[in-house]
Amino acid sequence: MATVKKLREKLLRGSRLSSQEVRKILQDLGYVLARQKGSHEQWIAGGRTFTLACHGKEVPHYILDALKKLVEEKIDG
């Protein structure tokens, strides 16, 4: 199992992530799974919502781009 730090580095390098790896990063950022309908999960933290669509093995690039912004915000403070 990869640590969250390694998963963040993998994300920032531009590598593909599985939905399970994305969930670990979201939990580390303080997000909590609020609800799920089908393959779409709604994660909430501090009034912000993040939707994770799990349609296949790898998460689509546009979701990874949004997650990358969240990780960079946490790093910058």
Residue ranges of predicted features:
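Basic nucleic-acid-binding interfaces
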Residues: 1-35, 44-77
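Ligand-recognition elements built from short beta-strands and adjacent flexible loops
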Residues: 38-39
